[in-house]
């Protein structure tokens, strides 16, 4: 009996260990591109604050342009393109987490009106599929299908991102109406300056934490510096740690002031946000407009014909 219980316990432990190892494998093997949008998704219920500011700006501090292009109007239950452009100088390199230089990535968040959502694959035309390429979009929340995120993806290939959007049909969704709706977009290029926990990344300027004289600068084996400053007020020593990446601007023996930049600003990226408007057009209204225009054209034609007929009658009476 004890042997059977021991065997059962060993079997359970092996099963549990395999499950844990499998979970670790899945987590560690997950593409890094899936991790970045989670920073905002985990910290904010809605990516757009009440002030209109998109929360990505809390980590990407530099202000850069972004542009969105959508049709002026769309019909219900149709697929259309929302094109987001994130321009930047393709020649520049950014500081990576290990201090080395690398290419910039881009990412975007698109906030659609309620009812609008990502178009399903079977509704996409070959032209749209070609524009999308290998991009993988995801909803900000399972319950918020109208908010889409993408990135980071290589900026050189995807500085222009095409979102395939499916418009809602008021006939099947009672909370959707034929109106003009706003859309909001945020786009970033490059790494952020602040991590979600509030700590700084190495994509920042490092400032002096004391006024005094630089006593010693030690270059670390894995990159970065350790700067010893002799405080001018009490002679104590203050050590500032510089992460790998930024270029050092000070030297030993140099007098510095509190908050003086010790390094250059390595950031070459930034975040921008914009908006656009789109009209969900009623097909009956379009048909009515076409009929109205057709009736006007027909009336004009009849008027011209009537005028010519009247002129012929007048001419015949004069000849008589």
Swiss-Prot record:
Single GO MF descriptor: iron ion binding
One of the GO biological process terms: photosynthesis
Parts of the chain that traverse the membrane: 286-305
Coiled coil regions, renumbered to chain: none
One term under GO cellular component: chloroplast thylakoid membrane
Cofactor list: heme
Membrane disposition: Single-pass membrane protein
Family: Belongs to the cytochrome f family.
Protein name per UniProt: Cytochrome f
Species classification: Eukaryota, Viridiplantae, Streptophyta, Embryophyta, Tracheophyta
Gene that encodes it: petA
